[in-house]
């Protein structure tokens, strides 16, 4: 399924914990625009570009808080090669591959406003770099060409909806991650992975104020780093996040979470996004009528990289009308996008909660402090949006972003094809389990005594990328 309409997104600070069969790994996240003044126009333009850059094959960007003043880019420092060298990459659950700008690359970005220097990966400087041939098993995941010659490389060509492109070849080298060795303690551990070595970027990928060294995809396909680690038995295809929209932090984990426990609902099979079956929706007990197409085709997408929540127009109108019946306020439109109002008392006491019920009777409740955000003192806006999202078959869909998922531990279990969640204090910690059965605490603020890694995921637009990814064999 390929989504056509562009939307908005906001993402925030988080920590990544990657659990392998014998180890767990962590990254520290940091927000780009922390403390800066809210700017809805900037937020909207970021959202639009974000949507354009999400790969068409799959979609689920990472997330953080749902505050408009947090809009920006989130990145992580990873280490590649031997000896390991640091690179700043966008972390994207909406795409499949890890790719890095490589030498030579005359069109790669040379500067960024993110307070770090951009770096080009140099195969000649790494003793463990190896080219991936077109006859390699990895290349067979993405290329159906019958004209492969063993001496040729396995190359990729990505075209994004905003017409940005990335071209390069796949190579195999060491990825160094931070292994969790105990409660709030880590140490480095290397794993061999295949990633793209980008030699030609254009459009927003080749310039821009928020340029990074590459993109790290956490998608469902066999080409993602997560799938590569799972194929060798080094990790399970399970990842989780806990997003704190109060303090702007949280946890992102790849691997088994021991606690808190979550209730799960099945993923809709054979989808390019993280789709679930929404069975019902109510405003403090008052049921809303769901479009029949939504229930029939499982057209509800869970996307932590999207900050807001988007509904078909008829459902959106019913939602807002029912909320206002409980608490009448005078709405006005801000920047042609957001419905806002003045309010001086506690919103949780005045406005009703909104609940979603999914297959297997799994419920998710969103409170007023989650679905309302402040632009300035006593000026609130709804995070609900009339999205107008449709599939290629013109079926309407619902997109549930971070404002629905914040302050909850959300688990995506690709092995068992379920998604689950539980209310949780995302500024505290979670328990993760390693392959030996050991259980360790990992927190958002004090993960380890080892150097912490910065993490980032582009918090811009919503949905899945309208993109075409083509792979060919190049000399």
UniProtKB/Swiss-Prot annotation:
Known tissue expression: Highly expressed in pollen and pollen tubes. Mostly expressed in inflorescence, flowers and siliques, and barely in leaves and seedlings.
A biological process from GO: proteolysis
Positions of the Peptidase A1 domain: 74-422
Gene3D superfamilies given in the database record: Acid Proteases (2.40.70.10)
Lipid-acceptor residues (GPI-anchor amidated serine): 449
Deletion consequences: The double mutant a36 a39 produces inviable pollen which undergoes apoptosis-like programmed cell death, exhibits a compromised pollen tubes micropylar guidance and has degenerated female gametes. The double mutant a36 a39 accumulates abnormally highly methylesterified homogalacturonans and xyloglucans in the apical pollen tube wall.
Signal peptide, first to last residue: 1-23
Protein function: Displays aspartic proteolytic activity. Together with A36, contributes to pollen and ovule development, including the apical cell wall constitution of the growing pollen tubes.
Name of this chain's protein: Aspartic proteinase 39
Organism, as annotated: Arabidopsis thaliana (Mouse-ear cress)
Lineage, broadest ranks: Eukaryota, Viridiplantae, Streptophyta, Embryophyta, Tracheophyta
